[in-house]
């Protein structure tokens, strides 16, 4: 049978549908059950819809102020974002006064029981006005519904329209309370549609060229965006807008002027690429820059689209000369090592082939927290025989996978990292990274370096137990 019930799930037999063992002879439609509510009793690693909107999509915007309409807990949760560094450079050549503004500040309404009983809309209005005065450099305000305000029915959109006129700035209401969907993926969708309907097409870029692209679903985790931008600059391609890494609020307004959209994170941001194509006839291309061969292939595809493949070839040749010798050394050190890829969504199908084909590793397990069926179809095609594919894994399953499949290293998020360490297994952060960037040629080299350093660290020789003992 292709589906597996872990021993720890004996009391939750429904989990069997979420765990799939890859077999070549299985029908294509055999996939883990996904994008459904977490089964009661599971200690899920998922985030909520609000986290998907603020923590992924809008949290990377450099000049926006965020007002969380919630009790203080959700505001604190909204502050715990990924490492999305931002520069001070603005599209018109000016400098935004605060570097990494998006990482430093967040505001909230701090709802109390009284606000829940009598409504919190007046408090939200006061908070937006006060926050705008406290941070006059912010060019826009984004406000968010949460579970509490979604349940009591506060109309954050009406408040946002009213306050926008009063303060003279865009106030964008993101209506993605935590319960809006089974995973943070619903928050991605809501934020995509909200930003498209409220912003796209409302302003023009300062300069346009024949080689303008939107880089969509690239959030500049630990500088990923800046790596890709350098490639494109060397090819003569202008990144007109990013969605939303190191972007300013106004960049989203002129996305409709690009000649092509490149969609990097296809789970969180294909929505807006489709909308741009439908309404403004901006075609989009799904791209993958993790690993050497994928990066080569997608740079060439972009160059060929604009009729400049020779420029892509030059970029590829230059980078391969720089990283080739060290990659070969690290391949020799990592070959045969077992790896478990445990990320939110697309990295689970971006990484298995590069890890196996380019570093000689063996991917023994892949698990995601919010992937959809189309993503699992890609995962299934890209992993080897007997690979374990798990949807919405819980903490006890994590322990059982470590015990039974003995990965030498896990690529995961912060929530899983320290549990893995306690079980004696090295772990490299694949969400926010250790020593990124991890994208592109030099990024893949950084990832290989971090895996090598983690696996061969002498600290593991000091442990008094092994996983499973």
From Swiss-Prot:
Functional description taken from the UniProt entry: This molybdenum-iron protein is part of the nitrogenase complex that catalyzes the key enzymatic reactions in nitrogen fixation.
PROSITE patterns assigned to the protein according to its UniProt record, in alphabetical order: NITROGENASE_1_2
One Pfam family matching this protein: Oxidored_nitro
Name of the protein this chain belongs to: Nitrogenase molybdenum-iron protein alpha chain
Cross-referenced SUPFAM superfamilies: Helical backbone' metal receptor
Amino-acid positions noted as binding [8Fe-7S] cluster in the UniProt annotation, renumbered to this chain: 48, 74, 147
Cofactor(s) this protein cannot do without: [8Fe-7S] cluster; [7Fe-Mo-9S-C-homocitryl] cluster
Database matches in InterPro entries: Nase/OxRdtase_comp1 (IPR000510), Nase_asu (IPR005974), Nase_comp1_asu (IPR010143), Nase_comp1_CS (IPR000318)
